[in-house]
Amino acid sequence: LTLIVSPTGFKHTGVFPEQAVNWAWYQEKIRASGRPIRVLNLFGYTGGATLACLAAGASVTHVDASKGMVAWARENAAASNLTDRPCRWIVDDCAKFVQREIRRGNKYDAVIMDPPSYGRGPGGEIWKLEDNVYDLITLTEQVLSDKPLFFAINSYTEGLSPAVMEYIVKMEGITGKKFGDKE
């Protein structure tokens, strides 16, 4: 994968290198599945996870509220020679997009979400992780296929511990019943 690095006004570079281990895990799961995999990447940012999944052979729907970030992700796909891979690039509020996917009946075999602590959607929607993550997980669970491969959530919000995220996912019943208690 080739990722374009450039400093932003938020002192980010467009890449979180610590995510490479997750990208490798996604690729391993997709390649080992032996079937076509549809991935939904919410809060897709500059596309590292999207590119990893595309490179492994999955089709991806990449969603981010920032038009600039989606454009950057597309540039990263071009730099990685992945523009011929099946990817939908969507600029939208993640929760609103998932609600529409539920109405459309679209299903995904894998979900990746890396929500920010705080953000604004393209229509001025306010996102606060601690206020909105449970509802988003509840919605997103509804777009999982009958044979989901994985549901990955990354979070660096200081006020929300990994134990709280794990509790939310278990409370929603995403683990166990759908994944056979394997992950």
Model segments located where?
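Conserved alpha-helix/loop element of class I SAM-dependent methyltransferases that forms part
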Residues: P17-R35
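Non-catalytic substrate-recognition/targeting regions of SAM-dependent transferases
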Residues: L1-V15, A24
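Conserved SAM-binding loop of SAM-dependent methyltransferases across substrates and taxa
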Residues: T46-A58
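S-adenosyl-L-methionine
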Residues: S66-I112
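C-terminal catalytic and target-recognition region of SAM-dependent MTase-like enzymes
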Residues: K147-E183
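Conserved SAM-binding motif I beta-strand of class I
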Residues: S59-D64
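Conserved class I S-adenosyl-L-methionine
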Residues: G34-Y45
